[in-house]
């Protein structure tokens, strides 16, 4: 009996550790969230942009059928009606083609999955993006099928410090599934297994804190291994990262979930926003990471903003503060902490705004200007030079340590990543002009923030590094960006 228990414990530990592995190709190590993109567009950009630029993976919007809401707000994607793979992003064939094409060029796909709930109340019969009908008010979803027996009793979350309410009542009216029921577990596992069969590498689990960790543990451990026909090794487990909003005073905590998979580290987003908005001196970022109360690096899915909190007021940065946003993202990708995800947004003026769509309410594909930036209402932060070049920086310096931290006692900082990379940031209202240790071999390096290395020439500023590793660093207040970054793969 003791031996059997030990074996079971070891197997359980192995499974949970495996669910922290994102299965990246080579030295790639950054995910991009292509929020509300069509599957055909993602496939094309995996081949033409994401793969060549060194992105490791794409988080895609929910793939299963959702309710059709008036005006088509973005959040309708979070109101599922069945597990058919039909949404405004495309159908199952298009989804499968996207996954294969992206895997073929080394870009993994992670699906935003909704295991907590089905659609909220809807007047009369609700119609889904795949033609299914349901009566959410009666908890009737025949295309699954689910009946009222498959849900928790109807109740509202009024006390966020009450575990029962948080995990068994309805989040903003969404019909709360009972993941302790065998039938519900079976349908959720079938859904995840189908996505794995199509070649996905893992899942972002929406509203994870609203489900008991023991129920999620059962579901995660029951899904199949990743599909070896898509380049995954034998016995590989899906990468799982879970949305658990924990500001440090929650009854349901992130620590209940971080052994099951990675957890979205919302404190990272909040604190990096405070720092680069000028509400906390950058000098304090030297101890960034667990010393700030964050999860351990391998358990934390980190981001400057996400599709939810970029729409909130407060300290979180988004694309509307571009200079500070680029500085924060550069720091995010340069500092050796966390599993990094960058945001790719569409423009919005109000919280509920739909993604770019035509008169028939079909999603519009992004188009591109002469500089490669997106048009048609898409922001595409991942295509900003200052961000995609930092993805390359992060790839180049992977597995190196942070060394030679420098700061001016305020909002100017710099540091090395081993002998492969150097970054400096100026968030003061006066120039940064210093001779600093870059830790790089002697030579001329292209600043990948102000430009790129193209055919052996730099389109932006360059930095001369002497035989002792020192270089003169200037970031003026008049500069378009408050960052300078150089690395060994950008040597002239």
From Swiss-Prot:
<keyword id="KW-0732">Signal</keyword>
<dbReference type="Pfam" id="PF02806">
    <property type="entry name" value="Alpha-amylase_C"/>
</dbReference>
<feature type="disulfide bond">
    <location>
        <begin position="155"/>
        <end position="169"/>
    </location>
</feature>
<dbReference type="GO" id="GO:0005576">
    <property type="term" value="C:extracellular region"/>
</dbReference>
<feature type="disulfide bond">
    <location>
        <begin position="46"/>
        <end position="102"/>
    </location>
</feature>
<dbReference type="InterPro" id="IPR006047">
    <property type="entry name" value="Glyco_hydro_13_cat_dom"/>
</dbReference>
<feature type="disulfide bond">
    <location>
        <begin position="374"/>
        <end position="380"/>
    </location>
</feature>
<keyword id="KW-0964">Secreted</keyword>
<feature type="active site" description="Proton donor">
    <location>
        <position position="243"/>
    </location>
</feature>
<keyword id="KW-0326">Glycosidase</keyword>
<feature type="active site" description="Nucleophile">
    <location>
        <position position="206"/>
    </location>
</feature>
<dbReference type="GO" id="GO:0046872">
    <property type="term" value="F:metal ion binding"/>
</dbReference>
<dbReference type="Pfam" id="PF00128">
    <property type="entry name" value="Alpha-amylase"/>
</dbReference>
<feature type="modified residue" description="Pyrrolidone carboxylic acid">
    <location>
        <position position="19"/>
    </location>
</feature>
<feature type="site" description="Transition state stabilizer">
    <location>
        <position position="308"/>
    </location>
</feature>
<keyword id="KW-0119">Carbohydrate metabolism</keyword>
<dbReference type="InterPro" id="IPR031319">
    <property type="entry name" value="A-amylase_C"/>
</dbReference>
<feature type="binding site">
    <location>
        <position position="341"/>
    </location>
    <ligand>
        <name>chloride</name>
    </ligand>
</feature>
<dbReference type="InterPro" id="IPR017853">
    <property type="entry name" value="Glycoside_hydrolase_SF"/>
</dbReference>
<keyword id="KW-0479">Metal-binding</keyword>
<feature type="binding site">
    <location>
        <position position="167"/>
    </location>
    <ligand>
        <name>Ca(2+)</name>
    </ligand>
</feature>
<dbReference type="InterPro" id="IPR006046">
    <property type="entry name" value="Alpha_amylase"/>
</dbReference>
<dbReference type="InterPro" id="IPR006048">
    <property type="entry name" value="A-amylase/branching_C"/>
</dbReference>
<dbReference type="GO" id="GO:0005975">
    <property type="term" value="P:carbohydrate metabolic process"/>
</dbReference>
<keyword id="KW-0873">Pyrrolidone carboxylic acid</keyword>
<dbReference type="InterPro" id="IPR013780">
    <property type="entry name" value="Glyco_hydro_b"/>
</dbReference>
<dbReference type="GO" id="GO:0004134">
    <property type="term" value="F:4-alpha-glucanotransferase activity"/>
</dbReference>
<feature type="binding site">
    <location>
        <position position="176"/>
    </location>
    <ligand>
        <name>Ca(2+)</name>
    </ligand>
</feature>
<feature type="binding site">
    <location>
        <position position="116"/>
    </location>
    <ligand>
        <name>Ca(2+)</name>
    </ligand>
</feature>
<dbReference type="GO" id="GO:0004556">
    <property type="term" value="F:alpha-amylase activity"/>
</dbReference>
<keyword id="KW-1015">Disulfide bond</keyword>
<feature type="disulfide bond">
    <location>
        <begin position="446"/>
        <end position="458"/>
    </location>
</feature>
<protein>
    <recommendedName>
        <fullName>Alpha-amylase-related protein</fullName>
        <ecNumber>3.2.1.1</ecNumber>
    </recommendedName>
</protein>
<keyword id="KW-0106">Calcium</keyword>
<feature type="binding site">
    <location>
        <position position="306"/>
    </location>
    <ligand>
        <name>chloride</name>
    </ligand>
</feature>
<feature type="binding site">
    <location>
        <position position="204"/>
    </location>
    <ligand>
        <name>chloride</name>
    </ligand>
</feature>
<keyword id="KW-0868">Chloride</keyword>
<feature type="disulfide bond">
    <location>
        <begin position="416"/>
        <end position="439"/>
    </location>
</feature>
<keyword id="KW-0378">Hydrolase</keyword>
<feature type="binding site">
    <location>
        <position position="210"/>
    </location>
    <ligand>
        <name>Ca(2+)</name>
    </ligand>
</feature>
<feature type="signal peptide">
    <location>
        <begin position="1"/>
        <end position="18"/>
    </location>
</feature>
<comment type="similarity">
    <text>Belongs to the glycosyl hydrolase 13 family.</text>
</comment>
